[in-house]
Amino acid sequence: MRKKIGVVVSGRGSNLQSIIDHIAEGRLEVEVAVVVSDHKDAFALERAAKAGIPTAVVERKGCKDKEEFEDKMDEALRNAGAELVVLAGFMRILTGHFISRWEHKIVNIHPALLPSFKGLDAQGQAVDYGVKIAGCTVHFVDEGTDTGPIILQKAVPVLDDDTEETLAARILKEEHKALPEAIQLWAEGRLSIKGRKVYIAR
């Protein structure tokens, strides 16, 4: 019996596609139970439909407050039987109202080597700062912004002529490897959390 994940998106869904592809290739042993989007026109919804994955749209503008929005998201995920919430290009910050219900059961992919360059425009921050190594981080989500315990990281070089766009493209290739890898570790029951550290059973 495969474990079920819910993938939460806002945009084009390239990390969702990577998850779908890894499952199809037999490299990721989970079922995507639902894809939840906060935008009805997100291309990620088309990717999900093409793969035969149920979808749900929960838009903030249709809710009286953030709590109602998060309640509806929670309902969509639980109704689908999701056991892990995967944020794959979800462009909103979740509050403790939602996170407390899914403690250590939400993972996020961030396009920087945390704790450096948190928040928006991480790739641009890296280029502007002049770092020589950048990358991506998969982490559990806590109530801070990109502060949760780190599961794994992938590094890429920053070239002298890099722009935000060229660096972002190089990092994205690693994101497409890192996120399915982290989900598979979870599915195999190999992740444990002690304080800030995530331990991976060998």
Residue ranges with predicted function:
Residues 1-43:
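N-terminal Rossmann-like dinucleotide-binding module
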Residues 1-7, 37-53, 75, 80-84:
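Non-catalytic terminal and connector segments of soluble metabolic enzymes
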Residues 22, 88-197:
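Donor/substrate-binding cores of folate-linked one-carbon enzymes
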Residues 30-68:
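Short, surface-exposed acidic-centric catalytic microdomains
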Residues 33, 83, 104:
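Conserved acidic residues
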Residues 37-38, 61-62, 66-67, 80-96:
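N-terminal glycine-rich "phosphate-gripper" loop used for MgATP/nucleotide binding
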